[in-house]
């Protein structure tokens, strides 16, 4: 298979291309020839919908997998959290690469922690789960939906403060220019009078003029002009200046890995949220590559990309999610972590407003983790998770 080109489908978003690029790099390191094929999905066309709503329909996955099943491409790269627990019969998850940090982060312009956000602060999120977790942890905060990809959401967060600073600097610059004009007119008038006075002490006059200039410079509020200030902004901040969001957000909650992969992690203030209190989405931080079950590319992909530990962890998470039956309809977090002979698995199921919660952390036997995962989910359903999920389905 190494001599045959592998056609790999991906979405065309910045994040998707970066994710696919990681897979391509690994395959090419193994001397495989790879062609990346961009495919537009329903999720790319519907730009005014929340990601949580798009997830209900498999909007980011279906078009890519259709290309695989039709033989147009050999395989497709997905974010594991977007992949439905029921995969078409003709497809197989051929490989699950090493998972990156699955944690969520609180994003603010200045690095404020969740505990320190003032009551009434507006927190934006595109996820039902994240919204419910924030409300459960900090009931006094106002959780609002936010649309767009990773970069768009960050720009919406930064835009209002940047606009205010731009206004402040523009007004100060106008005032300084007006003051300079008045001083110039006053100086011209004084010079006209002094020109007609005999025996004028020229040196004293020049000294006084210099003093006037120093007073004007010292009264300037900003060292930079508005143009110089704008030019000093980062590309992210300059792009944010072009946005005029309907809602002003004080913070966002989003996946750390999305910020990392788009190169934005170090351009904003973040607080990494504990995976114990803010349990991530099933498969968060992981990628997967799907292929036709009968394709000879399956072994090639598995040999080059498979990370066994990640496969076990995300499989345990997906078994719990499938047994719960919530999918993207209800606020559900599931996070599994291999620890020796056990798999520590944390589950949270919330009401949409975060006021009710059913959850548990349990050690699953690595030898029978799928069975244990089903039992964990069944126990949670019996303890009220089923009712929360049904309520969410009714409200959807």
UniProtKB/Swiss-Prot annotation:
Organism: Halobacterium salinarum (strain ATCC 700922 / JCM 11081 / NRC-1) (Halobacterium halobium)
Transmembrane regions listed in the UniProt entry: none
GO biological process, one term: protoporphyrinogen IX biosynthetic process
Name assigned to this protein: Probable porphobilinogen deaminase
Function of the molecule: Tetrapolymerization of the monopyrrole PBG into the hydroxymethylbilane pre-uroporphyrinogen in several discrete steps.
Cofactor, how bound (note): Binds 1 dipyrromethane group covalently.
CDD domains: PBP2_HemC_archaea (cd13644)
Residues modified to S-(dipyrrolylmethanemethyl)cysteine: 328
Cofactor names: dipyrromethane
